[in-house]
């Protein structure tokens, strides 16, 4: 089997940037996805350019912070910020203009490209793929990139995806045992499994803007551990990135 350890939230805070960098340089993370509207976007771009082996994707969002574009009336609240989560976006989806969705997501992609970053794949913040899949699919074809697999879609056409998207390594599931169970389930197959991760060093920026904080430092510890890397080697698990699909 092959595993892609993808680190979400690149740029959400300086601590997240450095936590992901640590998980890449000393651990098993080879891919990460960058938030175009994140507080530490410039730092993330700088780190990405200094580490060309780290595979960069776009972490498309309609639920975090403020949009790249202005005047998106159906996507934002009275303060001009995105609605806060998947549920609030889903509940208001009937009133969302999908043209606004496409324009904003395109702007996020173009901001990353304009910064000199090559994008290999797309995923989304708060896993909103089921709500915007037609737009995401269209943009993936346009930019020639891979996307994160999700269970609501059975036919991805010519777009490359892993065979499975694993979300278990999150919150109370952040443990070495979680990854071992995943490996044992797929060992001996040709499956490509993406494991969602959120490693970060905790800082005040992260505490202020994210509800998922404390487990992130534990993720760094596990993803960089010699024990995990030795186990994956013993099981002949190949660690790859989205570039390798």
From Swiss-Prot:
One GO biological process term: polysaccharide catabolic process
GO terms of molecular function: deacetylase activity; hydrolase activity, acting on carbon-nitrogen (but not peptide) bonds, in linear amides; metal ion binding
Position of the signal peptide: none
Gene3D superfamilies, A to Z: Glycoside hydrolase/deacetylase (3.20.20.370)
Keyword annotations: Carbohydrate metabolism, Hydrolase, Magnesium, Metal-binding
Binding site for Mg(2+): 59, 125
InterPro entries assigned: COD_ChbG_bac, Glyco_hydro/deAcase_b/a-brl, YdjC-like
Top-level division of the source organism's lineage: Bacteria
Subunit: Homodimer.
Protein's recorded name: Carbohydrate deacetylase
Organism annotation: Listeria monocytogenes serovar 1/2a (strain ATCC BAA-679 / EGD-e)
């Amino acid at each position: 089997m092959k595993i892609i350890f993808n680190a979400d939230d690149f740029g959400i805070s300086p601590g997240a940037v450095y936590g992901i960098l640590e998980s890449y340089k000393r651990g098993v993370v080879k891919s990460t996805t960058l938030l175009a509207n994140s507080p530490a976007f410039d730092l993330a771009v700088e780190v990405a350019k200094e580490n060309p082996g780290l595979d960069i994707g776009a972490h498309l969002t309609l639920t975090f912070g403020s949009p790249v574009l202005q005047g998106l009336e159906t996507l934002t609240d009275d303060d001009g910020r995105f609605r806060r989560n998947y549920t609030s976006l889903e509940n208001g989806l009937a009133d969302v203009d999908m043209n606004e969705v496409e324009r904003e997501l395109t702007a996020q992609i173009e901001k990353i490209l304009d910064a000199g970053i090559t994008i290999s794949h797309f995923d989304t913040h708060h896993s909103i793929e089921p709500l915007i899949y037609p737009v995401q699919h269209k943009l993936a074809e346009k930019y020639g990139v891979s996307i994160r697999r999700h269970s609501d879609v059975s036919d991805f056409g010519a777009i490359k995806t892993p065979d499975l998207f694993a979300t278990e390594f999150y919150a109370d599931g952040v443990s070495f045992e979680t990854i071992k169970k995943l490996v044992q389930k797929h060992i001996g197959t040709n499956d490509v499994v993406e494991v969602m991760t959120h490693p970060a060093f905790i800082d005040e920026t992260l505490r202020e803007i994210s509800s998922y904080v404390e487990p992130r430092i534990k993720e760094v510890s596990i993803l960089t551990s010699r024990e995990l890397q030795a186990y994956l080697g013993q099981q002949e698990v190949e660690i790859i990135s989205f570039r390798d699909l």
